[in-house]
Regions:
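Feature recognizes metal-dependent phosphohydrolase scaffolds
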Residues: 1-447
Length: 447
């Protein structure tokens, strides 16, 4: 983020991982618990404690006390990167991981009850557990839990935080809300980002646009709002900004909308029917882990569907493209980033090492200049050697569209702005020549 803030011209289309951090910065407990759970899961202690100065000692003490005899084997962190400044014993990290995960499930259950409009009742699972038998019922089928140790859960009231958990969350909230470094980065995301962006005739967004099974724009209902396509995206953008800059609830609950965008079934940043976090931890049967993508991902192979989305955003040029990310493109399995006969490109950046084994590459960059549109395919970076050297590979560049004539500044968004300013100056000059403005004889003094 510090590097991005030094760039002279940058814009960001918020993704689900962005908004959950943005929500956490407001003090929103569902977002805070998700952010911590994910980063502990991937052993990102350097970023949390050294980078942002988030105080994890209370969580470590709590986890060590509550889960001291629990091996927490299904909560062992993924050791993709080593922590140089703040190494944490994997066993302790696993206990911290489980502790915050249980807090998350409790807090989310409370918020699901508070927001029936989110339609997330199927994600309330703690009350579906038979704690004596160590089983859970999901969609009419019973499963044995592979981890049955729940020392902080009251079977009669499973979503209630213990006094110790409540105290812990208050301390963690303070680390986010009063975090100058984090808020500097979050404000940068707001100043330079949005749910979507139209630029030079192209449409950029992170994930998807909700569609019906027929490929039409889906009417989305969220609280008092009902709308689709661009209207829905504009509404979400407004609500995300309001939750940070002008919240009604000082306890961070306005940011529940960011939590919804993280995992909601109508979230254009998530794009799936559910987030099966609980099942991945506690149930062996991988069928329960399945997260089904929304109709959008089945329909974007259709050129007409892509063009209807572009048209809804006021983009009708034959060269207009949709550029999105979110979903890793599995090149090694024969998948292609191009959809809708070249009207849409999924260009996940591939920075996350966790996905590179799935994709076989290190993501894409989309290039648009005055003559062509091109796609650059990157190879994973080699490890930095002890002598400070590092091997880099040139990307594979594929031209995907050629302009009929070379574009000029006049054809760009900046050109349109300059044209508008020129027309305004012409109208001003015309009005002056017709005597619509009175000349002032008052002298201006310069001090």
């Amino acid at each position: 983020m510090d590097y991005l803030m030094q760039c002279h011209n940058i814009d960001i289309q918020w993704g689900n991982h962005d908004v959950v951090w943005m929500g956490a910065a407001t003090g929103n407990w569902p977002c805070i618990s998700n952010v911590l759970r994910m980063n502990i899961s991937y052993n990102n202690f350097d970023m949390l404690e050294v980078g942002y100065g988030i105080n994890l000692r209370p969580l470590a003490s709590f986890a060590n006390e509550v889960y001291k005899d629990d091996p927490c084997e299904y909560f062992m962190p993924h050791l993709i990167n080593e922590n140089k400044y703040d190494p944490v014993d994997p066993m302790l990290a696993a206990k911290m991981h489980k502790a915050i995960a249980i807090c998350q499930f409790k807090i989310e259950g409370q918020r699901i009850k508070l927001h029936p409009e989110y339609d997330l009742k199927n994600r309330m699972l703690l009350d579906k557990i038979d704690y004596e038998k160590g089983e859970i019922e999901i969609r009419g089928k019973r499963y044995t839990l592979r981890d049955r140790n729940f020392p902080t859960i009251d079977p009669e009231n499973p979503y209630e935080l213990t006094s110790a958990e409540e105290r812990l969350m208050n301390i963690l909230e303070a680390s986010f809300v009063n975090n100058e470094k984090l808020h500097t980065h979050i404000k940068f995301l707001y100043s330079n980002g949005g749910i979507y962006k139209k630029v030079n005739g192209n449409l950029l967004y992170h994930g998807c646009i909700p569609l019906t099974d027929e490929g039409k724009l889906k009417m989305c209902k969220l609280g008092d709002f009902v709308g689709k396509g661009k209207e829905y995206m504009d509404y979400l953008d407004k609500m995300v900004r309001k939750a940070y800059f002008n919240p009604v609830d000082k306890n961070g609950r306005d940011a529940d909308i960011m939590w919804y965008l993280w995992l909601g079934k109508q979230s254009p940043l998530f794009g799936k029917d559910q987030m099966t976090t609980f099942e991945r931890y506690f149930i062996e049967d991988k069928k329960t882990h399945k997260e089904h993508t929304l109709a959008y991902y089945k329909k974007i192979d259709n050129k007409e569907v892509c063009e209807s989305i572009l048209k809804n955003f006021g983009l009708t040029s034959e060269h207009s493209k949709i550029l999105s990310g979110h979903v890793p493109v599995k090149i090694k399995d024969g998948e292609s980033p191009a959809r809708g006969e070249g009207r849409l490109y999924i260009i996940d950046g591939g920075i996350s090492k966790a996905y590179q084994k799935q994709t076989g590459i290190a993501g894409y960059t989309f290039i648009f200049n005055s003559r062509i549109m091109a796609l650059a395919e990157h190879k994973p970076y080699s490890q930095l050697q002890k002598d400070g050297t590092q091997k880099f590979s040139s990307p594979k560049v594929m031209i995907v569209d050629e302009m009929k004539r070379r574009l000029t500044i006049e054809d760009t968004d900046i050109g349109k702005q300059l044209r508008s300013k020129l027309e305004n100056l012409k109208r001003l000059l015309k009005a002056y020549r017709r005597g619509y403005f009175k000349e002032s004889n008052e002298k201006i003094r310069l001090s």
